[in-house]
Amino acid sequence: MNSNDIIDVADLDCIYLSYDEPQKEEFWLKVKHMVPWAKRVDNVKGSDAAHKAAGEASDTERFILIDGENMPEESFFNIQLDFTDKDEKFRQAQFRWKAINNINGLRYGNGGMSSWTKEYVANMKTHEHQKDGDVSRIADFCMGGDDNLYWAMWDCFSTTYPNHTPFQAWRAGFREGVKMSLDRGARPTVDQFKETVSSRNLDNLTIWHNIGADVENGMWAIYGARLGTYMTMLTEWDHANVQWFDNYITLWEEHAHRDPETEATAIGEVLYDKLDLPMCIHTPEQSKFFKRHYGADKYNRGPLVTEMEVIRQIQGW
């Protein structure tokens, strides 16, 4: 073992990456109290450009990134990344840990803590900088093929709060309603939908469509998620628009005056009829019940355990 085999997270630069989140100043103060050495990158347009700016702000080759809506657990900064006996790819990989979503209780990478290397971030081309003809990176960093060094990890170290305002909650739902309907960034046909969209995405999409009435602005998130799926799968709307946050403002102006529950119910009937998606908005009490039991058997296994490792164990691959 050499000195580079184990990295203390506390020795890494920590970048708080914010844009237009309504709670970003409050969260920045909390992050600075928790992580006094934290730095901030704010209001950089475009996800790829913002991450590149975060990489440039870091003085350490590997760094920790906190999204603007995310509040980490303080214990995260006491952990170590132990690369002893790990494949060399672990040292090169980017890690996306899970976050608990405050709206619906989901635990996955959306909004979660992440760790990047300056070299990788400087050379990646995602979102607004994706390569011509490559749609896999339109709305996410998830990548396949030989360059797959962006890894979904199993452990959960934070909670994301994308529901501070009606617009923020609606946008969060809409974005996920679009992303989870796609097949590696491409829009499937209606007939292909259930075959090409992974079962895990469908499970999470269904939860976005139905859970969250127990929290402030949760119904706006449900409406947004249903609308995102509807516009992606059943209209001619260009789903590539999802990558630019400015586009949401214009779209929001068309929907801000509407009643979210009434609209979500109407869209739900169409999604059930055309895509055979389960539509059942849970009451606040039912949502609380679901979230309590959904997270009951979730526990951390180690910061370098990948999500795929656990899935293989569970499914006996």
Where are these regions (language model features)?
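Hydrophobic beta-strand segments of well-ordered beta-sheets in folded domains
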Residues: 10-16, 36-39, 63, 89-96
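Active-site nucleotide-sugar/metal-binding loop of Leloir-type enzymes
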Residues: 52-62
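Short acidic, S/G/P-rich loop/turn micro-motifs used as interaction or catalytic elements
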Residues: 19-23, 70-73, 102-104, 120-123
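Catalytic-site signature of metal-activated, phosphate-bearing donor transferases
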Residues: 81-317
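N-proximal low-complexity "stem/linker" segments adjacent to membrane-targeting elements
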Residues: 1-33, 317
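A short, glycine-/small-residue-rich helix N-cap motif at loop->alpha-helix starts
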Residues: 42-50
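Short beta-strand-to-loop acidic/aromatic patch adjacent to the donor-nucleotide binding site
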Residues: 61-74
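Short alpha-helix within the catalytic core of nucleotide-sugar-dependent glycosyltransferases
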Residues: 51-52, 74-86
